[in-house]
Every structure is written in C-alpha cells, then in structure tokens.
C-alpha cells in the first residue's frame, strides 16, 4: 500500500526542469493501467468494432452488388441501343436508297410529263397556226371574191343595158325551171 501512496506522491512531485531520468516505478508509469484500459476496450469494443466492420463490409458488398447489377443493366441498355442504332442505320440506308430511286423515278416522270406537255403544246400551236392560216385564207378568198364580184357587177352594169339584163335574167329563170322539171 505504501507503494501505492508513493506513486500518488510522485505524481504530485514534478522533477525540476532540465533533468531527465528513467522512472523504474511500474505503477508510476501506468503500463498496468494502460493494459487494463486496453484490455477493457478490446473486450467490450471487439463486438462493437466487429459490428461496425461487418456493417461496413455488408454496405461495401451491397454497393458492389448494386454496381454490378447497374453495370449489367447498362451493358444491356448499351447493347439494345447499339441494336436500335444498327436497325435505324439500316432503315436510313434503305430510305436513302429508296429516296434516290424515288427521286430518279420522279425525275423521269417529270421529264416524260414535261416532254408530253411540250408535244401537246406544239400540236396545239400547229393546229392554231393551221386554223389561223385557214381563216386568213378564207378571209382573203372572200375578199377577192367580193372584189371580183364587185368588179364583175361593175363590168356588167357598164356593159349591159337594162334590156340585156332582163333577157339574161329570163334565160336563167328558164334554165332553172327546166332543171326543176328534170329533177322532179
């Protein structure tokens, strides 16, 4: 017991500054106290520490498991996206090919339609020209006929007298009458 009280006395007494020494008193250096504290901490803290480590381990494993599931899901989505991309690219190529062939077909149809329309317009133009030529020719003929008729009437009026007119008219009426009898 005396050692115990001496250790308390030594705790209250500090060596003077500048001195350095080795303390051989085991109780004064507290290795026993420290070992008891460490033993208690290890004994009671072991379960808590194990629980903490187990919880941490489970969280890490769950995180890894979730990460793996997410990775697999992401890989599946990536594969699906790649498949859709290939499908869309194939459809785009098909549309492009169909579009080019459709454009060529429409171009040929437009060329053919335009050519046909131009031929029809050319025919209409030619027909219009022919009709106008015929109308002009008929007008010229009519004009010439009227001028010739007026000239003939003028000549007849100047050359023939009234008596000659009457005899010519009577002769013509007689011819018409004879022709009528023949036809009846």
From Swiss-Prot:
Classification via Pfam families: ATP-synt_B
Keywords recorded for this protein, A-Z:
ATP synthesis, CF(0), Chloroplast, Hydrogen ion transport, Ion transport, Membrane, Plastid, Thylakoid, Transmembrane, Transmembrane helix, Transport
An example Gene Ontology molecular-function term: proton-transporting ATP synthase activity, rotational mechanism
TM ranges are 27-49
Q: Which GO terms describe its cellular component?
A: chloroplast thylakoid membrane; proton-transporting ATP synthase complex
The cysteines covalently paired via disulfide bonds are: none
User: What is the topology of this protein in the membrane according to its UniProt annotation?
Assistant: Single-pass membrane protein
Q: What does this protein do?
A: F(1)F(0) ATP synthase produces ATP from ADP in the presence of a proton or sodium gradient. F-type ATPases consist of two structural domains, F(1) containing the extramembraneous catalytic core and F(0) containing the membrane proton channel, linked together by a central stalk and a peripheral stalk. During catalysis, ATP synthesis in the catalytic domain of F(1) is coupled via a rotary mechanism of the central stalk subunits to proton translocation.
Q: What does the subunit comment say?
A: F-type ATPases have 2 components, F(1) - the catalytic core - and F(0) - the membrane proton channel. F(1) has five subunits: alpha(3), beta(3), gamma(1), delta(1), epsilon(1). F(0) has four main subunits: a(1), b(1), b'(1) and c(10-14). The alpha and beta chains form an alternating ring which encloses part of the gamma chain. F(1) is attached to F(0) by a central stalk formed by the gamma and epsilon chains, while a peripheral stalk is formed by the delta, b and b' chains.
Tell me which family the UniProt entry assigns to this protein.
Belongs to the ATPase B chain family.
Q: Name it.
A: ATP synthase subunit b, chloroplastic
Q: Which gene encodes it?
A: atpF
